[in-house]
Amino acid sequence: MDLRVIENLETELAIEIEGEDHTFMNVLKGALLELDGVTAATYDVNPEQSGGQTEPIVTIKTDGSIDPLDALEQGASRVRDKTDAFEEAFEAAA
C-alpha cells in the first residue's frame, strides 16, 4: 500500500491510497467518523477531474481539535484493532 498526499491543510487532508478498494475504504471511513474531532471523512475512487477510474482518495476534515494526519493514524489503528478482535472471535468460534 502506497500513500500520496494530495492536500494537507490545518483541518483537512486528502490522501491517495494505492491498491485499495471499496472494502477497505468503507472500513477506514467508518473508523475515522468514530473519532472525536473528525467532522467529515469521505473517499472517492472516481474524481471528476481524473477522467476515469483512479486509486481511492480519502478526505478527512476536522474541527481543529485534532490534526487530520493524526486522525488518519488513529483511524488506521482502530481498523487494526477491530481486525484483530474479529480474528480472535473467529478463531474462538472455529
From Swiss-Prot:
Keyword Secreted: no
SUPFAM superfamilies with a match to the protein in the record: RBP11-like subunits of RNA polymerase
Enzymatic class: transferase
Gene Ontology molecular function terms on file: DNA binding; DNA-directed RNA polymerase activity; protein dimerization activity
Main localisation: cytoplasm
Keyword Cytoplasm carried by entry: yes
Annotated localization: Cytoplasm
Catalytic reaction equation(s): RNA(n) + a ribonucleoside 5'-triphosphate = RNA(n+1) + diphosphate
Gene Ontology CC annotations of this record: cytoplasm; DNA-directed RNA polymerase complex
InterPro entries: RBP11-like, RBP11-like_dimer, RNA_pol_Rpb11_13-16kDa_CS, Rpo11-like
A Gene Ontology BP annotation from the UniProt entry: DNA-templated transcription
Pfam families: RNA_pol_L_2
EC number: 2.7.7.6
Family of this protein: Belongs to the archaeal Rpo11/eukaryotic RPB11/RPC19 RNA polymerase subunit family.
Function: DNA-dependent RNA polymerase (RNAP) catalyzes the transcription of DNA into RNA using the four ribonucleoside triphosphates as substrates.
Subunit annotation: Part of the RNA polymerase complex.
Name under which the protein is recorded: DNA-directed RNA polymerase subunit Rpo11
Source taxonomy: Archaea, Methanobacteriati, Methanobacteriota, Stenosarchaea group, Halobacteria
